[in-house]
Amino acid sequence: TDIPSLISFSDIENVKIPDEKARELVHGYYACISYIDAQIGKIVEALEKSGCLNNTIIVLWGDHGWHLGDHGLWNKHTNFEQATHVPFLLIDPSSPAQKVTTPVEFLSIYPTLCDLAGLKKPLNLDGESLVEVVKGKKDVVNIKPYAVSQYPRVGKMGYSLRDGRYRYTCLLYTSDAA
């Protein structure tokens, strides 16, 4: 998906950043990742010490990825894979550990937590519960085989559909999007 017109998803001018500044930005990004990893470790350690780890559902996710010079961008606001493919971790102590690589939507987090906690879900709730996936009873593709991302720009709207293998992205100009 290295299509030149997709660069216009960014409102930030496409200016060449000097190599030294680029290294500094990448270093800062990795420092942030290391810092948050340490903070998560502190939370898990506190849950363990308090005896709550085995009855606590842990959910970690990032709201977007980040461009570190790929596609000539140094930001987060695009429909490129680097911005929409984000970390998502859900640990339910009563469920088997597993790794799922099929994309899911953030809309599914709330209904999943409602089901895991035994709470009644509100009517007309967006998103599909992934509780059957978390419990190891179903594959994500049996619930929803794709994830959708949408990103508006001035005068444009970008859409992406992603499954486990393919991604389709389109850019519609405002007059086309109506």
Question: Predicted segment positions?
Answer:
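Active-site-proximal cap/lid insertion segments
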Residues: 1-103, 116-123
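Active-site/binding-pocket entry motifs
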Residues: 14, 154, 167-168
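Polar, surface-exposed loop/tail segments
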Residues: 54-56, 94-161
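Residue-level detector of short, conserved catalytic/binding motifs and their immediate flanks
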Residues: 86, 159, 166
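Low-complexity, glycine/alanine/valine/leucine- and proline-rich hydrophobic stretches
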Residues: 164-172
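Conserved small/polar residues in nucleotide/adenosyl-binding loops
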Residues: 173-178
